[in-house]
Amino acid sequence: MQPYSEGTFDDVAKYKFEQTEDDLEAAKLLLEAGKYKAANNRAYYSCFHAIDAVLAKEPVAFKKHKDTLSYFNKNYVHTEIFPRDIGRKISRLEIIRHKSDYDTFYIASKEDAAEQVSVAEEVIDLVRKYLELNN
């Protein structure tokens, strides 16, 4: 049995980013399987975990998604650490995920799900580069 270690903030960021990659892979598999609502969900969470990985470096953490996204937009998008259009794309990801999870009458399309996965890939690529530069 190894002694308990809390790790570093870099360890937390790495762990969160691993979740990101797992969620993105799941989103792609679900898209291919025609499970568009589930693909939307995983695409959103892949981005959310990527954002969490960025914030883990500070370190800050929030209990609510809206607070996490608001902080990220204020401190990383509005300051142009990340491109401004990414904030809008993440906002759309959140809206589509919410519809997919909670709107009984929302019908997810292949096109929307493919767009969600594409945006997730874009965000994750930007976060990967950011984490590499700020490691």
Named regions from a protein language model:
Residues 1-135:
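Terminal alpha-helical segments
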